[in-house]
Amino acid sequence: MSCRLLLYVSLCLVETALMNTKITQSPRYLILGRANKSLECEQHLGHNAMYWYKQSAEKPPELMFLYNLKQLIRNETVPSRFIPECPDSSKLLLHISAVDPEDSAVYFCASSHGENTEVFFGKGTTLTVV
């Protein structure tokens, strides 16, 4: 019985690892002064919905933007310096103008089949503004 459980857990971990490779973000780490920058995300899962989350130090992730079937749903608390772009259903960009030290955080891209389904996350982009 324990061998079956170990095999099952191993297969679940492999599946999770494979899912993570199907959502890519670039760059992975970014350190810069006040400038304009774009973050990129691409998913190869055939999902209809894509998201950007911001996780500041010692805070839970905050949903910034959601594109569902290429329709934008915006978190109104996000500053207008953050502009998402969804050129197609598999790619999501996040343009940041005049980055500020308060923008230092980890930015996660995610995707799902729709708003109320399982969400798969990329590995994140760590942005440090100096």
From Swiss-Prot:
Q: Which UniProt keywords apply?
A: Adaptive immunity, Glycoprotein, Immunity, Immunoglobulin domain, Receptor, Signal, T cell receptor
Q: Which residue ranges does the record annotate as region V segment?
A: 22-112
A GO cellular component annotation here is: T cell receptor complex
InterPro entries from the UniProt entry: Ig-like_dom, Ig-like_dom_sf, Ig-like_fold, Ig_sub, Ig_V-set, TCR_beta_variable
- The question of whether Zinc is a record keyword is answered with no
Annotated spans, D segment: 113-115
Taken from the record, one Pfam family name reads: V-set
Disulfide bonds, paired cysteine numbers: none
Q: Which GO terms describe its biological process?
A: adaptive immune response; cell surface receptor signaling pathway
Name the PROSITE patterns on file: IG_LIKE (PS50835)
| Protein name per Swiss-Prot or TrEMBL | T-cell receptor beta chain V region A20.2.25
